[in-house]
Amino acid sequence: MLRTMLKSKIHRATVTQADLHYVGSVTVDQDLLDAADLLPGEQVAIVDVTNGARLETYVIPGRRGSGVIGINGAAAHLVHPGDLVILIAYGQLEDAQARGYQPRIVHVDSGNRIVDLNADAATAAPGTAGAPVPNPLADSLA
């Protein structure tokens, strides 16, 4: 049986540009692609932390060291410069391999510079997490 598992994640990157008229895809600094083990053309999900939008596209390499995260094509209607995003890639692994697999997790700062690598996928790197969103139903659940 194959399991679809988290393979790569670039956490809380800042969108630096958007080009509605580009053919499509997301442009990502080559340093971030290398750190996250993402290849040009690889499918990624983009989760917009700022507005909740989710979409799928593929990556194209951007200039190394530039910090570029560029949203291209129709996705520019959903994701805008300055938005915080999470880029996620999944892989299919055999059950035994999946049980021991460690994904590549890349935490970045506001300039999209790497601040932490291969941390626990469920733990934010120091200084990268925002304030928790309050649960509006918390009082009624108590």
From Swiss-Prot:
This is Aspartate 1-decarboxylase. Its main location: cytoplasm. The gene is panD. Is synthesized initially as an inactive proenzyme, which is activated by self-cleavage at a specific serine bond to produce a beta-subunit with a hydroxyl group at its C-terminus and an alpha-subunit with a pyruvoyl group at its N-terminus. It comes from Salinispora tropica (strain ATCC BAA-916 / DSM 44818 / JCM 13857 / NBRC 105044 / CNB-440). It is found in: Cytoplasm. Substrate binds at T57, G73, A74, A75. Its cofactor is pyruvate. The active site is at S25, Y58. GO terms for biological process: alanine biosynthetic process; pantothenate biosynthetic process. Keywords: Autocatalytic cleavage, Cytoplasm, Decarboxylase, Lyase, Pantothenate biosynthesis, Pyruvate, Schiff base, Zymogen. Pathway: Cofactor biosynthesis; (R)-pantothenate biosynthesis; beta-alanine from L-aspartate: step 1/1.
